[in-house]
């Protein structure tokens, strides 16, 4: 019972931490949005860290039968898990078309000269590498245990954080090569989620 209470307290603490860390809004500028994503990934990672050890302690304290119930060993839960597995697999695919579209929009809006094009190419490569790295950390199925699911989330958050950092570096370098007018056009762009 004590371990369950510790887990409940950790979940409550993580929820409060997340609630206090919610941004008041989403910035318009691409680099500012990436900075916000960076900070939110760090917040999510901290929340997962708060829960991890109490969850692990709780799971270890259970009998095999209790652990099976916690991990969803009922026919209904297995069916839901199979449906979720299918969703996980489909939601992780990298979209080169979306990357190419975004790069095309930047090129059209900003109107680059020949000396600036390599920096945009670096941005495109950073997006492509980030997509590949995220794909490599995409789970092929939902792990059975609660701790394993949490560890999968931790791994995915870490991969997302590294992807954001690589894109930030490329975007900052790209922005540094733009004229003031081009920077204004770039910062004024909006990108709809594809």
Where are these regions (language model features)?
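Charge-rich (acidic/polar
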Residues: 1-194
